[in-house]
C-alpha cells in the first residue's frame, strides 16, 4: 500500500450525557487503522488542556502520531435515535489548521491523505492546497457544510468552492450532501467537479459516484455504537484506493471492514 496519513483536529465529545471523551476524525481513523492492522501516520490538533491525555491515547494506538496544540479543543454533545440518526450540539470551536501545523518534511512521503475536519473553519483553501501538493486528498464533507458556531449543529452549503479544486475524493454523509444540493438527485453532486464522491447513509450503505457511474453499496447490518463509523469507513476506503482497489471495490471492502470493526471481529 502506498504511504497513507490522516490529518484532523481531535474533539472533546459527550455522548448521551456520558463523561467527556476523546473524539474527532483523526482519533476514530487511528483506532480503525490499528484494529484493521493498516499502517499510517496521524497528524492531530487539540487545545493545551487536553494535550497530555490525548497524546497518551494517540501513542497507545501504536501509530506514528504528531500532536499540535493551540486554541480550544472543539467540543460536541451528541445522541442517537433508534435508527442511528445523530443529533449534535457544538460546545466549543477549535483553532483552525494552518500550513505550518503540518510541516512539508513530515508529509513528504505521504501519497494518500485523509483530511478529517470537524467544522468548516478547520481547513481553508490555502492550507488544503499545500496539503494536496503531490498527493491525493480524501476530504470529509463535514469541512464544507458544518457551520463553526456554538449551539445546535447547523449545516449549510455556504462554503468556499475553491476548496474543491484540491480534493480527489469527497466523502459526504447524506445530510451533508443535502446541505449542498437540497432535494436534487444525489448524482448532481458530480457538478462539484470532484473526480470521486462517496455518499454514506449510515446503516443503509453508501453511493459511489466515480468514472461516470453511480453505484449503491449496501451496508452490513450491525448492532453497535456507530460513533466514528464514518471516519473508519473513510480511512478504510482510502486505504483500499491506495492499495489499488477501484472506487466501488474500495467501498465494498471498507463496508466489510467497518462492520467487522464495530462488532469486534476486525483482524
Give the ranges of each region predicted by the language model.
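Alpha-helix C-terminal capping segments
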Residues: 30-39, 240-243
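Conserved beta-alpha-beta core of the PfkB/ribokinase-like small-molecule kinase fold
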Residues: 112-187, 205
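Conserved N-terminal subdomain of the carbohydrate kinase-like
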Residues: 2-4, 11-20, 35-116, 121, ...
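Short, conserved phosphate/pyrophosphate- and ester-handling motifs at nucleotide-, phospho-/glycolipid
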Residues: 33, 173, 230
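Active-site metal-binding loops of divalent metal-dependent hydrolases
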Residues: 8-10, 232
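Short beta-strand scaffold segments in enzyme catalytic cores
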Residues: 31, 76-79, 206-209
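Conserved phosphate-binding/catalytic region of the ribokinase-like
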Residues: 154, 158, 184-267
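Short, charged, surface-exposed secondary-structure boundary motifs
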Residues: 76-77, 146-151, 224-228
